[in-house]
């Protein structure tokens, strides 16, 4: 029999990892096209509040998920217009998107702070007290399984489909891709909006399952961790998933150390997972000799030459 505390740690790890991985996977798609989006934090927040408001007002979880995903994707389209169409600085646009997303979600969600959901994303299988690893896996809600499916689909798409090859070509050398007849603007626009949709799904998971309520700034820097996970995973879906599991484990473990007799400052408990993540990224970069595997054109706007 596995210790109940270890099963609780595993359950908390999977929940934290799911939230991070979905957002990171969306950012991976966006960056594969050569677009850097630092607005993930704001997009998660927009999806979270939109989904929560819809769930409170309609009691329809399916509709809440759809609204959250579409709202975040629409919000990401602002970044697409600014950076892909208008060719403006991607870093500045992303930072503004984060600030705007957090402020906007706080504004429209102020009347929903403290409200409770009558219904939320439930586990796919009704297992109240898991007693083994299999039951822990089966007790997760549907977005956990969707995340696994998305990982497989995205990995296959990037390697084996025309859309994946277009993303790769545009992200590595947009001018060469354009010369071959690929529509660089369209590809980058779609990739950016897809990234927003994934961030919205992460936000919906946050407010409809992970912590089923709404309050200001509840994303708590998870968008930035998602960005770091893309780098950690070398722009590979499976490696990014492993990174999400690692950070999810750290996020779940640190608060539990106190139950094992470790006396920790509460501020240290809050920031420890983020500090450890930064250290891992630094060590990984040093180990790789500074080579991260990033798309060569990332962050560089595409200007079509006259032909």
Regions found by a protein language model. Name each.
Residues 136-214, 237-242:
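Helix-loop-helix "hairpin" substructures at the membrane interface of multi-pass membrane proteins
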Residues 90, 101-160, 262-269, 295-307:
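Transmembrane helix-bundle core of multi-pass membrane transporters
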Residues 213-274:
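Transmembrane alpha-helical segments in multi-pass inner-membrane proteins
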């Amino acid at each position: 029999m596995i210790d109940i505390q270890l099963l609780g740690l595993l359950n908390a790890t999977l929940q934290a990892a799911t939230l991070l991985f979905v957002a990171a996977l969306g950012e991976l798609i966006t960056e594969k096209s050569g677009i850097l989006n630092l607005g993930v934090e704001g997009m998660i927040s927009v999806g979270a509040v939109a989904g929560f408001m819809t769930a409170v007002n309609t009691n329809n979880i399916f509709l809440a998920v759809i609204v959250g995903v579409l709202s975040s994707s629409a919000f990401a389209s602002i970044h697409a217009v600014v950076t892909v169409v208008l060719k403006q600085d991607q870093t500045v646009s992303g930072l503004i998107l984060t600030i705007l997303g957090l402020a906007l979600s706080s504004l429209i969600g102020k009347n929903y702070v403290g409200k409770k959901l009558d219904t939320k994303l439930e586990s796919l299988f009704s297992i109240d007290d898991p007693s083994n690893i299999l039951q822990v896996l089966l007790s997760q809600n549907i977005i956990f399984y969707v995340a696994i499916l998305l990982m497989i689909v995205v990995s296959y798409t990037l390697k084996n489909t025309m859309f994946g090859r277009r993303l790769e070509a545009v992200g590595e050398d947009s001018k060469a891709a354009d010369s071959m007849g690929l529509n660089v603007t369209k590809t980058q626009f779609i990739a950016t909006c897809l990234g927003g949709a994934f961030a919205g799904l992460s936000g919906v998971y946050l407010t409809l399952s992970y912590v089923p309520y709404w309050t200001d700034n509840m994303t708590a820097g998870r968008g930035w961790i998602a960005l770091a996970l893309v780098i950690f995973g070398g722009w590979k879906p499976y490696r990014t998933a492993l990174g999400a599991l690692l950070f999810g484990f750290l996020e779940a473990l640190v608060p539990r150390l106190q139950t094992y007799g470790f006396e920790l400052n509460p501020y240290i408990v809050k920031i420890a997972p983020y500090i450890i993540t930064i250290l891992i990224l630094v060590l990984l970069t040093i180990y790789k000799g500074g080579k991260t595997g990033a798309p060569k054109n990332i962050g560089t706007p595409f200007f079509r030459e006259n032909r």
